[in-house]
Curated annotation (Swiss-Prot):
One of its GO terms (biological process) is translation. It comes from the Bacteria. Belongs to the bacterial ribosomal protein bL35 family. Pfam families: Ribosomal_L35p. It comes from Streptomyces griseus subsp. griseus (strain JCM 4626 / CBS 651.72 / NBRC 13350 / KCC S-0626 / ISP 5235). This is Large ribosomal subunit protein bL35.
Amino acid sequence: MPKNKTHSGASKRFKITGSGKVLRERAGKRHLLEHKSSKKTRSLTGTVVVAPADAKKIKKLLGK
């Protein structure tokens, strides 16, 4: 049986920590920022942990 290929789109979007948590960037900060408040754009910075239900699927796509 051949190995499963890593999903290249998922590998660009998600990172797995040493403890096994899946991290992602927040959506909504690429463009059309003019009408969004400074408070909103600041809150969209940084990474967040993915929900456990989604993390299982993502790990499968990444071959972990």
